[in-house]
Regions:
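C-terminal extensions of enzymes
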Residues: 158-177
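Glycine-rich phosphate/ribose-binding loops and adjacent secondary-structure elements
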Residues: 2-158
Length: 177
């Protein structure tokens, strides 16, 4: 973290992302190392960029993690000094309210935002099936073959994504969240 501070001239906050396996100890380590923000990711996150055993069986649900991370921050007298942002399975307003009530400073969404933008759109069903999945079940965004054109660098696939429509859909999702 010190090296990052030197590179950035101490002008930007340093975020450290930790998984939900050992929230108390990993939060403590991040704070003692000098993090400005701890991003705690629970096991229900939609990552597809790892082996199935990690996706399904490693970590704890985000709500179980928050209490331990907050306790670590309180034990260090850093609660509300070092921000705690939580993610991983946050899908609706009730999830956000629970996270905030447990002591998080903010929440973030990932997969929910992709779906709101139009990923997993049924109109690309045939192409999802070619990838061995179906619309609504696609989660291999890291492969860069997203038929909806959202999580890809393929110029032809990217043409499918309408940023105006995607923005409208995401805006609607966030309003009702």
């Amino acid at each position: 973290i010190l090296e990052l501070r030197e590179i950035t001239g101490w002008r930007v906050p340093i975020y450290v992302k930790i998984g939900g396996a050992r929230p108390y100890f990993d939060t403590t380590l991040a704070v003692k190392a000098g993090a400005d923000v701890v991003v705690l990711d629970g096991m229900q996150g939609g990552t597809a960029a790892t082996q199935d055993v990690f996706i399904e069986h490693v970590g704890q649900p985000i709500l179980a993690c928050i209490r331990e991370a907050v306790r670590a921050l309180q034990d260090l007298d850093m609660h509300r000094e070092v921000q705690l942002i939580v993610s991983g399975g946050v899908r609706n307003g009730a999830d956000v309210a629970k996270c905030m009530a447990l002591g998080a400073d903010a929440t973030s969404i990932g997969t929910a935002a992709l779906i709101a933008l139009g990923d997993n759109d049924p109109r690309w069903e045939a192409e999802y099936q070619k990838l061995g999945t179906t619309a609504g079940a696609y989660d291999d965004w890291h492969e860069g073959k997203d038929p909806a054109g959202i999580t890809t660098q393929d110029p032809e696939l990217m043409k499918r994504f309408d940023p105006i429509e995607g923005g409208r859909r995401l805006n609607n999702y966030l309003k009702v969240m």
